[in-house]
Amino acid sequence: MGSNSSPPTVLQLCYENVTGSCVKTPYSPGSRVILYAVFGFGAVLAVFGNLMVMISILHFKQLHSPTNFLIASLACADFGVGISVMPFSMVRSIESCWYFGRSFCTFHTCCDVAFCYSSLFHLSFISIDRYIAVTDPLVYPTKFTVSVSGICIGVSWILPLVYSGAVFYTGVYDDGLEELSSALNCVGGCQVVVNQNWVLIDFLSFLIPTLVMIILYGNIFLVARQQAKKIENIGSKTESSSESYKARVARRERKAAKTLGITVVAFMISWLPYSIDSLVDAFMGFITPAYIYEICVWCAYYNSAMNPLIYALFYPWFKKAIKVIMSGQVFKNSSATMNLFSEQI
């Protein structure tokens, strides 16, 4: 008599014949190809897009300004995500296994957190920079100098690196969750379980600077509207050369603030789902399905690839710089002093 029972499902492991190996839950071949293409494209764009930003700002002397140095340093953080975080997370997300060892798992997690906070710090300082530039454009050059920008860059790197290293290399992040962490700590896994205290600290560390940036940019656009009305009034009268100069400077700073404001909004939208999900998981017993978690993670990662696209859309100088770099003209001795702006202010 034939049996109607189906054959037992073969359990796939990350490491066959290894005791304590994690269970592998692979996608179908078609899905894997699509996911590798999508995630790989994000990583490539993050690496090469941000590399273009760094080369443009550091090579062309016309772009050597306090704001642009902050943008170049922000691009460096996003470049770090693209080259040291996204490729390995891509394999982990698609294969559902970590094949790079326990030590590199810790290093990878540190880089992930450090680059995220570095981006947040850079954007916070850029918001302050834009606030001063728009509210007081003529005094701004004496307030936000290259030296001040250098200090901001130093803080934006040192604090996140020290914080992430101290948290993940000392093991304080899973205090009170040792049993759960041990249960998830199978061979081929890189699952970091963070306790409620550190998740709350992380969430507040994201929320407070975000609220400050929202307030600053809200004030920036209120001031910008007032300045626009003044410029209209000046335009309807006989304007002096001094008033004309002030109007052009104010217009330039508002345009820069708008572009960088879009960058800040993109960061908030990208990272907010992950921040909320982490908070909910910590206080609700890690209830988020794996696929929801992966979507939140990759929305955050993709932010590192978005900034160069934003600059390309709103900064004519960046598009011109890319053409010079890609055409090989950048290797000419005179390229560093090339004019990238269509109009001078």
From Swiss-Prot:
Chain residue ranges for the region called Extracellular Loop 2 (ECL2): 174-187
Residue ranges, Extracellular side: 1-32, 90-107, 169-202, 277-282
Topological type in the membrane: Multi-pass membrane protein
Disulfide bonds: C22-C186, C105-C190
Name of the coding gene: Taar6
The entry's keywords: Cell membrane, Disulfide bond, G-protein coupled receptor, Glycoprotein, Membrane, Receptor, Transducer, Transmembrane, Transmembrane helix
InterPro entries (alphabetical): GPCR_Rhodpsn, GPCR_Rhodpsn_7TM, TAAR, TAAR_fam
Segments in the Cytoplasmic topological domain: 54-68, 129-147, 224-259, 303-345
Name recorded for this polypeptide: Trace amine-associated receptor 6
